[in-house]
């Protein structure tokens, strides 16, 4: 589970990201992000995940993917630029990704959006 300050839960924030967020796309994920409203400077970035039924009709598979993404994001949260809201939306082919591919996809999108304070080393395949 992501630490509480890094979780994006507000419905209005999700809607604002869908409507006005900047978009970066990868092969298996879409990243929507935008700065937090004025007065929220210095607050840690918040991350939300969307795993729709297009990914899989099985809730078990969707929840497993959600847990995997959270575990990839957990150590990255302190390295995110403060003051942003992020939303990761999965594409249907993301279920086929192995762990190293999934890590690389998340890192690639965060670097593409220039949201990492210090670039973390590329994940090593295990």
UniProtKB/Swiss-Prot annotation:
It catalyses: Endonucleolytic cleavage of RNA, removing 5'-extranucleotides from tRNA precursor. It is an enzyme of class 3 (hydrolase). GO terms for biological process: tRNA 5'-leader removal. Keywords: Endonuclease, Hydrolase, Nuclease, RNA-binding, tRNA processing. GO terms for molecular function: 3'-tRNA processing endoribonuclease activity; ribonuclease P activity; tRNA binding. GO terms for cellular component: ribonuclease P complex. RNaseP catalyzes the removal of the 5'-leader sequence from pre-tRNA to produce the mature 5'-terminus. It can also cleave other RNA substrates such as 4.5S RNA. The protein component plays an auxiliary but essential role in vivo by binding to the 5'-leader sequence and broadening the substrate specificity of the ribozyme. Belongs to the RnpA family. Consists of a catalytic RNA component (M1 or rnpB) and a protein subunit. This is Ribonuclease P protein component. The lineage of its organism: Bacteria, Bacillati, Cyanobacteriota, Cyanophyceae, Synechococcales.
